[in-house]
Amino acid sequence: MPTPLRASPASAAPSPLPQRILVVENSRTHARLIGEAIEQKLNLPVVYAATLAEARAALERHPDWFMVVTSLVLADGSHDEVVEFFLSRQLPTVVVSGVYDDGLREQVLRRQVVDYVLKNTPGSIDYLVWLVQRLERNRRIAALVVDDSRSARQHAAALLAMYGFRVIEAADGEAGLAMLDANPDIRLAIVDQEMPGMKGHEFTRRLRARHARDHLAIIGISGTSDGSLVPRFLKSGANDFLHKPFSREEFFCRVSQNIDQLELIGTLQDLATRDFLTGLPNRRHFLAECHALLPNTLGRQQSVTAAIIDIDHFKHINDTYGHEAGDVALKAVAQAIARHAGTQDLVARFGGEEFCALVPYLGESESVDYFESLRAQIEALEVDVGGPKLRMTVSIGVFRTRFPGQTLNHLLSEADRRLYLAKAGGRNRVVSGG
């Protein structure tokens, strides 16, 4: 089942990850082709250099570097000097070359270079953009390596770290399960077959029973020649399998393919459950989540507060400022609602200019204060629509109950009735009684 979509409260944001990319290329035309594709498709800042001297100056000007894309042919450095210059600064480095040379490729990949990419070939720019995006996203993903061989485990972990993953290691299946429980952000598991206590395919079976395919990718690995092992892993729930020894490039391609598929599934789930304009959960998903929350909360005689929030005079906003401005207004209100909501609150765009919230555990006066605060925050917004700042207000109907047996339809109907009273009473107000 997909993870419930709930808005989180505003909190101290984690330190932002470095975003700046250095493109080092003696051909300024090709440098621009690479850099502009990255900027346009990924919205990441790019700085250019044509020599190691220019690269050194750029690195000294800015502290927040994410990675480097560099040619091996520079006026002031040999192949080895170029690679060493960037790796010594612990920057993820992708090398681009105009010619394919097996010896040079092997020489480069023996270092900690992320990839060796041919330029001026069909699709090379698209591949570079994909690679940069993959490395950028990997920084937010944790990966688990489960292998009883310390050297093999550390080898796989080092490769994953090179590709930007946060890596967690375990020497056997039981330790691996404990690591999964302690680190819910793990999205990838690399699992060896031969381990004491629990074979890799059995660990995979137990892992898959806890984590669905839309949450966790599992790749089995083994050096055995047993032909039955691959289907055994796959039937136990693995997404893929690699035979040892494997090349760096094959490992990265398999890992990336599986993570790409996880993200595609997540995108499709978002399309099915989120409102495309505001990013809030949509009506259908909200109702499903509410039906799950309501019996548990009211069954323990805890309170639940339902609210319907409607933008006042929204038609006037569209008619006066245009429909694009109306969309901007909807997004601004949605963002205010999402910032205000707590981790257990359910919020959604219901349709048009109407939003809905279901908030557990509020006291009677707290429920009014909660939505009065939201109303005031929205009233204080000044929305940029390309001219005079847009100001707007909302009316909110609120209904609170703690009685078991109350249906969601009843809660929403009562909240809607109070919304009507708020509109009739002059708008820009919260009505909870009546």
Predicted regions and their residues:
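Active-site-proximal structural segments of metal-dependent nucleotidyl cyclase/transferase enzymes
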Residues: 289-321, 337, 348, 367
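Active-site-proximal alpha-helical element of nucleotidyl cyclase-like catalytic domains
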Residues: 325-346, 354
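Catalytic-core segments of nucleotide cyclases and related cyclic-nucleotide turnover enzymes
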Residues: 368, 401-434
